[in-house]
């Protein structure tokens, strides 16, 4: 595989210029001032918001605390405004080799309030960008909606169906579609030729975890090909809400914690990985790895995970076999990436199989480290800074 920053950057500039000439002054202003034009990508990719907020009132969810509301509002950008916002983002790059995109982080993308905007955004992402796209949903999709997915020719689509409980779904997710409808969606997606995954997140210890094997078996029977085993990030409100309905998890969290806390769940995750393999589901510890596998399934391309999970403790040795993919990188591309993204001229560059050693004079701040992570994603190699 060849990883070229200059090719991605040139494609980005050409598309950006085209849309700037096409859109009105007001549309350009909205796009360039929007958060999609400014945010750093997360490990799963750059999150795309087709709505803000959620009214499903899932007991374990932190979204109501982010926005201070339990209702949904469709996102304000048009499809082409979203594309310009992304192309205006210093840390976004187009094409299948570029930035992963993820729907479903702060809303339900296929809720009736959000679905039209979601499909609009998907259409224009496919038309202009062609990036890998992942969505997570609890909502059932009709046949005509699934058929819209078939029209996309450039993006690689990775469908994640969120399902953590059948027995307790009615109290954990009171306003969400029933688990049976989600299993039906998995069947419908497989029938239409797609390769859906079950998104097992959050992983709630004790009572919910006890039925995990049954949930995974039902998802496998419905046609899921793999499972993303997530973590669980809690707040005081979430802990109290769970306690009210009989789910006590205090043993897993420190006393008097403030803000958000991610539970330590390694033994639970390891157990689910083992169970998944036994029943024929491919397990993943992160959504980006499932997206990477979808690229192989959809496009026949073996591209290493954008988040470099194969160099961390997140790799589960899926069929992509990222660690054994040779990535060719040119020194001029590395120099250009540091100049364009960080405004830094490296003193020396040493490109090795899995690492790029960079010598710079400046001490790098926390933000600079995040920018280095962006460059790592382009080249699929760890960057080691030497001073």
Give the positions of each predicted feature.
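Conserved Radical SAM active-site core
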Residues: 16-158, 167, 356, 361-387
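Alpha-helix capping and helix-coil boundary motifs
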Residues: 78, 211, 330-333
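A broad, structural surface signal
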Residues: 56-59, 217, 221, 270-278
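Short, exposed beta-strand "edge-strand" segments with a Pro/Gly-rich flavor and a Y/T-containing core
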Residues: 71-77, 171-177, 275-277
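Conserved AdoMet/S-adenosylmethionine-binding subsite of the radical SAM
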Residues: 80-268
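C-terminal accessory extensions appended to soluble enzyme cores
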Residues: 2-23, 241-387
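Internal hydrophobic scaffold segments of catalytic domains
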Residues: 37, 41-48, 52, 63, ...
């Amino acid at each position: 595989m060849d990883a070229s920053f200059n090719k991605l950057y040139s494609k980005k500039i050409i598309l950006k210029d085209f849309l700037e000439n096409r859109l009105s002054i007001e549309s350009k202003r909205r796009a360039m001032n929007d958060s999609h034009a400014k945010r750093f990508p997360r490990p799963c990719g750059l999150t795309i918001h087709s709505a803000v907020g959620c009214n499903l009132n899932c007991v374990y969810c932190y979204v109501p605390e982010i926005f201070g509301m339990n209702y949904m509002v469709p996102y304000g950008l048009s499809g082409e405004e979203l594309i310009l916002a992304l192309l205006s983002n210093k840390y976004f790059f187009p094409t299948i080799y570029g930035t992963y995109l993820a729907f479903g982080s702060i809303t339900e993308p296929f809720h009736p309030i959000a679905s039209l905007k979601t499909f609009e955004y998907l259409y224009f992402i496919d038309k202009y960008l062609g990036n890998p796209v992942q969505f997570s949903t609890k909502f059932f999709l009709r046949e005509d909606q699934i058929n819209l997915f078939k029209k996309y020719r450039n993006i690689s689509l990775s469908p994640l169906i969120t399902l953590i409980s059948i027995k307790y779904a009615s109290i954990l997710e009171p306003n969400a579609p029933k688990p049976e409808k989600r299993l039906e969606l998995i069947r419908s997606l497989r029938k239409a030729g797609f390769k859906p995954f079950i998104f097992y997140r959050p992983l709630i210890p004790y009572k919910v975890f006890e039925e995990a094997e049954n949930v995974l078996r039902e998802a496998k029977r419905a046609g899921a090909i793999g499972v993303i085993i997530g973590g669980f990030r809690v707040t005081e409100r979430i802990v109290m809400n769970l306690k009210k309905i009989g789910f006590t998890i205090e043993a897993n969290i420190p006393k008097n914690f403030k803000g958000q806390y991610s539970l330590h769940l390694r033994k639970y995750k390891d157990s689910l990985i083992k169970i998944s393999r036994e029943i024929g589901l491919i397990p993943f510890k992160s959504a980006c790895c499932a997206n990477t596998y979808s690229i192989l399934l959809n496009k026949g391309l073996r591209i290493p995970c954008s988040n470099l999970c194969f160099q961390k403790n997140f790799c589960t040795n899926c069929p992509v076999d990222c660690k054994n993919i040779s990535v060719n990188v040119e020194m001029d591309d590395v120099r250009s990436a540091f100049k364009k993204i960080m405004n830094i001229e490296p003193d020396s560059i040493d490109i090795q199989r899995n690492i790029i050693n960079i010598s710079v004079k400046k001490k790098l701040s926390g933000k600079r480290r995040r920018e280095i992570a962006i460059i790592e994603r382009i080249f699929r190699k760890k960057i080691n800074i030497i001073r």
